[in-house]
Amino acid sequence: MVTSWYKIWYHTTQVIFILLFVGFSVVVPLDCIVQASDSSNDAVNTFIVVGAAVVLVVFGISISFARVLIFRRSLQDIPKKYIPVTAQDMRHKPSREYVIENMKRAGELAEKFKVPKEPVLHAGMEPKDSDMFPEHLKYAEIVKFISDRFRFDGALLLNFVTESDLSTTFKTALHKLFENEKHPYKQYLDEFISLYEKFRFSGQDIERNDFVKFLRLYKYLADLSNNLDLTRIESVPSQFLHVPTEDYDTDARSRTDSEFSTPYLRPYPSDAFMHNTTPASHVGSRSSNFSYDIDESAEPPESVEDQQRYHDMLTRVDTYNTVIHR
């Protein structure tokens, strides 16, 4: 109650003083004009009238500038870290609430923009300084590599089958491989296929947790497939390999240099190395009817230096004895 009466008294006296000031400011020039009109000296009369008007204008400008200077000096006395958050600091309540709301938002942003203590996990790519995968590894490229190995090489998990035609999908081949298996294997297989199709066809970035789960299921099913009987897999000649799978030996380290007759798992083999294909039942030993449709007599003779240079270049390819057995 006291505060409200104080405000009323303060505003009332302020209005009275302003009216008195404006009244005196208007009356003084008029009084000078009236008194000068009674005088017979026109020069003195003109000086008095103009002087009164000039004094009034200068006085008003001086008061305005003085108010601005005093206001700025008062602002300089306020500490830079001072924020008006109380009713005594800022009378306008909406403005005070706006300041407080922005202070809270600034605090939340400051916590988010701090340097993270742990690596930031972005979907689709491995973070820097990772202890699980190579840094900046793109998860989608790994999934695509698994798909391409099946499509072009007939590689299904850790086995090599002949069902690598375009008509056979990765999902169909897996169901064929585990068709006689029961739960809980089928549950893990369905989960693995679901993740694979999500990664390949959803168009979304792969989350790190889903990718780790995908690799664990891949390893589990790959280990399980080693104990399966691959003879029950139906034989279908591949359009891309141009060679039966029995011509590939899974134990490449047991081969001698002369036994390596074709590049290892190439997506598009050269036309010069195409040969007659015969249906094969499963991965096994070398076929006895393996032959090349190439006339080696047409090849120019190579010098010893050229052979040694080619040998050195090929042995640098470190992909599990792909070309030359060392």
Curated annotation (Swiss-Prot):
Residues 35-45 are extracellular. The keyword Transmembrane helix applies. Residues 1-13, 67-326 are cytoplasmic. Keywords: Membrane, Transmembrane, Transmembrane helix. It is a multi-pass membrane protein. This is Defect at low temperature protein 1. It is found in: Membrane. InterPro entries: ARM-type_fold, DLT1. Its main location: membrane. GO terms for cellular component: membrane. Residues 293-305 have a biased composition (Acidic residues). The chain crosses the membrane at residues 14-34, 46-66.
